[in-house]
């Protein structure tokens, strides 16, 4: 279930990123001004209607992702890309920290051609910046079917803090 953070009258846009375990990725993007709602789920695989255990088993091809609804009048897609590069190591293939497997891969799923172009330009800029010693392995792909994760995974860190 998506939790609305704010509301405006302007049309919202969507962005989808995979950068490791979706719990932390979602928590980082929820702090960004202009992000209206977030949800976590799965994208980019070949297995229909996967559950967490399916994805964890590495048989689905899906990545854990956060889907973001944002107000482009308050935050740009390029700003969201900057957060994406800041919150994970885009040079490790199918791994973030101790989490290993293709479900933890670094991936940007674009929703339109403007996002595709911005993602490619951003990746190239970060690569030549010298910020990372190794090559960036982040995939840039057109969005595919998004499968919402179960409620227990939504805003996971916020729920844990309330315990």
UniProtKB/Swiss-Prot annotation:
Biological role: Has an important function as a repair enzyme for proteins that have been inactivated by oxidation. Catalyzes the reversible oxidation-reduction of methionine sulfoxide in proteins to methionine.
Name used for this protein in its record: Peptide methionine sulfoxide reductase MsrA 1
Pfam families the UniProt entry points to: PMSR
Enzyme Commission code: 1.8.4.11
InterPro entries found in the cross-reference section: Met_Sox_Rdtase_MsrA_dom, Met_Sox_Rdtase_MsrA_sf
GO molecular function: L-methionine:thioredoxin-disulfide S-oxidoreductase activity; peptide-methionine (S)-S-oxide reductase activity
Family recorded in the similarity comment: Belongs to the MsrA Met sulfoxide reductase family.
Active-site residues, as the UniProt record annotates them: 21
Keywords associated with the record: Oxidoreductase
The reaction(s) this protein catalyses: L-methionyl-[protein] + [thioredoxin]-disulfide + H2O = L-methionyl-(S)-S-oxide-[protein] + [thioredoxin]-dithiol; [thioredoxin]-disulfide + L-methionine + H2O = L-methionine (S)-S-oxide + [thioredoxin]-dithiol
Top-rank taxon: Bacteria
Taxonomic source organism: Nostoc sp. (strain PCC 7120 / SAG 25.82 / UTEX 2576)
Gene3D superfamilies attached to this UniProt entry: Peptide methionine sulphoxide reductase MsrA (3.30.1060.10)
GO biological process: protein modification process
